[in-house]
Amino acid sequence: MKRTRLTLTIGLLCLVLTGSAIALERVSARSAEPAPLAQVPQPGVDNEACLACHSTPGMQMSLPSGEILYLTIDRETYLNSVHGQEGYACVQCHTEMREYPHSPFLAKTIRDAKLLLYQSCARCHQDKYDATLDSVHQKALAGGNKEAAICTDCHGAHDVAPPDQPRSQIPHTCERCHSEIYNLYKQSVHGSALIGEGNPDVPSCIDCHGVHNVSGPSNQPFHLFSPQICARCHTDKQLMAKYGLSTDVLDTYVADFHGTTVILFEKIAPDQETNKPVCIDCHGVHDMRKVDDPESHVIKENLLDTCQKCHPDASTNFPSAWLRHYRPSLEHFPLVYYVDLFYKIFIPTVLGGMGLFVVFDGTRRVLNRLRRENHHG
């Protein structure tokens, strides 16, 4: 019995010593491990964890194309952006960077990097993103043009500004890609007022072309329906009165042979290109000028050249047949006014007289018939 107890005691002692040795070994192994992962960015990390690295000056990486991708983010610039002010986290856009070390960066060029990242905008701005899918920019991108504008090209990335910025900044955004058009626009009656004077009443690029569903001349209905774009401002009586401009321009255009044909196209064949001029064909597209500007396409000295774009055989007197956008009056085209007035009086008088003659003649015939019947009766 004593021998059995001694054997059990020795066995238990061996187990205790073995367990202690294993525990000590585990403790030693743990002490040799690197710092816990809680010290590096994890899913749900805040912006300060990202900026701890990405606010370091000169942070960059080389791409396979040989381009340098700068990774330093200016803290104040981001915090003053619309996203920074709303407290959005970096990882809401950079979803593939939620863990550290980061996943391999797949972009080969800086442009590829932008194309990979801009689609994250759709997570919060789905309706705006969907609108871009029908734009000329998106169609160009789908056609293989990687330089076509995407969200971040216009709005920026870490410096997104709120939409209440001065309207005069809009043309400068478009200028990044459309510099030649911008140079024409800034000298036009619209552009000089907006860019040079800060006048908020004149149209910027997006007022005519749209914001996210940007349209342009490559879209046939855009040209056909462009008079309606011009009419938004030029039929606004309050706005036009402010600048002493007539609101008759649309009505006089529609009453003209050119405008009548365009309206028929709009109603009957909206997908077909019209063979008649619209506003921009005569006044210019981005280079519209004041009517008394020597560079204006519709000033008297230049009008023949404008007409000859469609009427190559037009003579010097040809433009005189056009009433411009004036309604005939004693001041403008008095001869046409008097002819028009004459027919306004003459035609109702003739038709009215004929109508009275028919009525009197018919009445007389009925009365004569009644008299004959009474006489024979």
Features from the language model and the residues they span:
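Short sequence/structural segments immediately N-terminal
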Residues: 3-11, 19-377
